[in-house]
């Protein structure tokens, strides 16, 4: 009789464990996340893969859509996610203010909303994970000032500043961080033109400005978008000289794409404020999981040993929690660091 009870209890325990394991699998399979991005190529593909891979490893289903840069299409896509009843929404906003329409609709439906790379403006989301774009602008600004000081013995000269889409928070921060440094030096003239993240617009800006005046440096909001076409345009204008030669135009940018790292190695460009692109998505997955688990999160420093983005800063702002991952100041001196996403 005792042996029968032991066997029965053991079988019941195994059945319970099996049932719990199936429940866990079902719970994971029931997590559906809608992911809306402007595109899924270049840096955006790296961001998406950084999210998709760990999400799918948890058994989550990821639904992805692209807007092609059309803010209204992005809103329509997100409304479709809401109608489908997804468990969370992740977006790379086309329009930082315009995205608030979708954020409000998701909130009314009880769906947590996260943004990557670019924050919302005018509404609160659960969290935004992004590079410290202001820091990146600072780093590029300091590099330009150092070059001008070395060239002229003091910080003076002319800088062409090609922005992204200034309706987006990320471009505003990249501009603000750079301006904060450059504006300290009254003898540096800055020519600022909006490039809207479009390579052809960047080319036209370079042609228009350099056809009528000389510049000492060019700062670009995205080397992924502008660097290769800018170098090619300088060659076509017969204004290209490699680093170290007379006439070299110093080129600084943000992102750290592989194409620009190659140009830095060649001496065509000089500095990049590298983003921890693949880590954006994985960090969002981590915080969505915390939300699903009912875990509270608190402001403060986030440290991960060995990560180039560490330490990061988690802050509560008027647009919700923001996790600012540090950018890496890249030059010819540290270009081969394997941790740089452009080297991966």
Predicted segments, located by residue:
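Bacterial N-terminal signal peptides that target proteins for export
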Residues: 1-11
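Bacterial N-terminal signal peptides
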Residues: 10-21
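Sec/Tat signal peptide C-region and signal peptidase I cleavage site
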Residues: 22-28
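Hinge/cleft segment of the Venus flytrap/periplasmic-binding protein
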Residues: 31, 162-166, 170, 181-182, ...
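Hydrophobic alpha-helical
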Residues: 88-108, 178, 195-263
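Extracellular/periplasmic ligand-binding modules, especially the Venus flytrap/periplasmic-binding
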Residues: 221-229, 264-265, 271-296
